[in-house]
Amino acid sequence: MRLITDMVLVFTAVVRLRLGLLFLISGGSKFLRARSVERMVANYRLVPRSLLPIVKLMLAPAEVAAGVLLLLSLWLPVYAIAWVLAFGLILVFTAGVASALVRGLEIPCGCGLLLNGHVITHATLVRNLALLSLLALDLLVQRTLLP
């Protein structure tokens, strides 16, 4: 039983490591492409124009913070805030993707350097739902297997 528990804990640590790196890359790319971030958010047609500059200023730092906190949560007691921030961001991104798909928008996902220019599809939605599921699994493991 201990071997299975250890394997699950290693798996969830890898999930946090990979998601942390994903957020760092995505947020970092938004810092590098700051001019296009506002347009990318505007493409989703969900945020009032008056709020676009605020969202633009907050998005990259929020993603980088989520990435840093997820990585630090492997060693420091910052898991709760890391989880809430990461889950919240992915949830908002997933809602945006779902809304765009329902409305038939063919727009770039704005996912960062790795998927720059990638047009959202149902696969984008499934990917985001998988990320949410992995975070939910990680939370379950943290609440049940660790003291």
For every predicted segment, state its role.
Residues 1-147:
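Membrane-interfacial helix-loop segments of redox and metal-homeostasis proteins
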